[in-house]
């Protein structure tokens, strides 16, 4: 069936779709990884977004049972140049098209993705719609992602514990990826997942050894009412922030954030460790960054920077056992170069024990 990607600028790209039932609006972004489409479509950080894949052939290894980052699709739609009709992998349980049909996830094919990405790079991430009828298109009633309670949409509503013999880590869920949980469990941590709006008192009753502030979708300032609690928690327990968690911790301790013209989304983002000068290839998915000039009035030290655009990719607190990274050390998809971040965090937790930093 003929279908279209229509940008908010009015520019239209024609393609084909097999599973369209209604128009789907979202923020159009692009992902530069050659693989990892299954992780992308199920990553809560992509909530509400139409994802353009820059690699020309998507779906060639199908969908399997083990690479999901959440229990359901999170992206609003997928846009590809060409898709493989079959999944050629021994673990594949269905094709990408079959999965999208099953979950009513729009999969728009035959699109000139190079042209779309060029527009995004020139004009920034923007509203867009996948439609089969150009006469229906109207952005007047579309609710921008900046006005949606995205974290509330993806965060857990209950407390859940996974047993382990190591340190007890409370994972504050802003839209966490399954691979972050797996990275802690493989280190034999006991992990308790709590909602994003958890109170200090509830966390205190759980008696954690450390806290992990997870990734998630949207603008960190959408939940700035949580900053006082985040400040109190991170001042009390050794903490690691990843992606959105990194931004929230930065805000809670006095820094500021801003939106990039187009975000970092891919499995090939180079960052440099400012202390060792070691370069890492990292997996990233974010639209917002910490403003470097806002660090001057805080107790943060920058630890990582993006080599491509010089943006802040990591922080450590000068006096408290808090470290943050904008990238994803658990990867999935992507390289595991920065997996040592988890080791460093566990070392902080072990060194501190259950002693509070200060009351």
Curated annotation (Swiss-Prot):
Residues annotated as domain Glutamine amidotransferase type-1: 168-355
CDD domains: GATase1_CPSase (cd01744)
Record InterPro entries: Anth_synth/Amidotransfase (IPR050472), CarbamoylP_synth_ssu (IPR006274), CarbamoylP_synth_ssu_N (IPR002474), CarbP_synth_ssu_N_sf (IPR036480), Class_I_gatase-like (IPR029062), CPSase_GATase1 (IPR035686), GATASE (IPR017926)
Molecular-function GO term, any one: ATP binding
Pfam families (UniProt xref): CPSase_sm_chain, GATase
UniProt-listed Gene3D superfamilies: 3.40.50.880, Carbamoyl-phosphate synthase small subunit, N-terminal domain
Segments for region (CPSase): 1-168
Substrates-to-products reaction catalysed: hydrogencarbonate + L-glutamine + 2 ATP + H2O = carbamoyl phosphate + L-glutamate + 2 ADP + phosphate + 2 H(+)
UniProt-listed NCBIfam families: CPSaseIIsmall, PRK12838.1
Role of this protein: Small subunit of the glutamine-dependent carbamoyl phosphate synthetase (CPSase). CPSase catalyzes the formation of carbamoyl phosphate from the ammonia moiety of glutamine, carbonate, and phosphate donated by ATP, constituting the first step of the biosynthetic pathway leading to arginine and/or urea. The small subunit (glutamine amidotransferase) binds and cleaves glutamine to supply the large subunit with the substrate ammonia.
Record-stated family: Belongs to the CarA family.
Protein name: Carbamoyl phosphate synthase arginine-specific small chain
Gene: carA
């Amino acid at each position: 069936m003929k279908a279209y990607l229509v940008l908010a600028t009015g520019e239209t790209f024609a393609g084909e779709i097999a599973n369209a039932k209604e128009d789907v609006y979202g923020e159009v972004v692009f992902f530069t990884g050659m693989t990892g489409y299954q992780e992308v479509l199920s990553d809560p950080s992509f909530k509400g977004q139409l994802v353009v894949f820059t690699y020309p052939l998507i779906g060639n290894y199908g969908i399997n049972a083990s690479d999901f980052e959440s229990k359901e699709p999170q992206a609003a739609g997928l846009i590809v140049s060409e898709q493989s009709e079959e999944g050629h992998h021994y673990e594949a349980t269905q094709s990408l098209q079959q999965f999208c049909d099953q979950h009513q996830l729009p999969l728009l094919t035959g699109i000139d993705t190079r042209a779309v990405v060029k527009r995004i790079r020139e004009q920034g991430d923007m509203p867009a719609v996948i439609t089969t009828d150009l006469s229906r298109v109207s952005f007047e009633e579309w609710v921008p992602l900046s006005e949606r309670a995205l974290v509330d949409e993806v965060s857990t509503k209950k407390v859940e514990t996974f047993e382990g013999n190591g340190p007890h880590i409370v994972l504050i869920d802003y839209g966490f990826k399954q691979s972050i949980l797996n990275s802690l469990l493989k280190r034999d941590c006991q992990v308790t997942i709590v909602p994003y709006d958890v109170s200090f008192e509830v966390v205190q009753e759980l008696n954690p050894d450390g806290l992990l502030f997870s990734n998630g979708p949207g603008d960190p300032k959408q939940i700035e009412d949580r900053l006082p609690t985040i400040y109190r928690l991170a001042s009390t327990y050794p903490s690691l922030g990843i992606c959105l968690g990194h931004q929230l911790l930065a805000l809670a301790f006095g820094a500021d954030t801003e939106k990039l013209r187009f975000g970092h989304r891919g499995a090939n983002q180079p960052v440099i460790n400012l202390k060792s000068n070691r370069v890492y290839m990292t997996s990233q998915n974010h639209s917002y960054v910490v403003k470097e000039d806002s660090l001057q009035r805080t107790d943060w030290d920058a630890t990582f920077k993006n080599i491509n655009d010089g943006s802040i990719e990591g922080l450590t607190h000068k006096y408290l056992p808090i470290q943050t990274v904008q990238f994803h050390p658990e990867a999935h998809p992507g390289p595991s170069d920065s997996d040592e971040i988890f080791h460093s965090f566990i070392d902080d937790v072990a060194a501190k024990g259950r002693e509070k930093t200060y009351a």
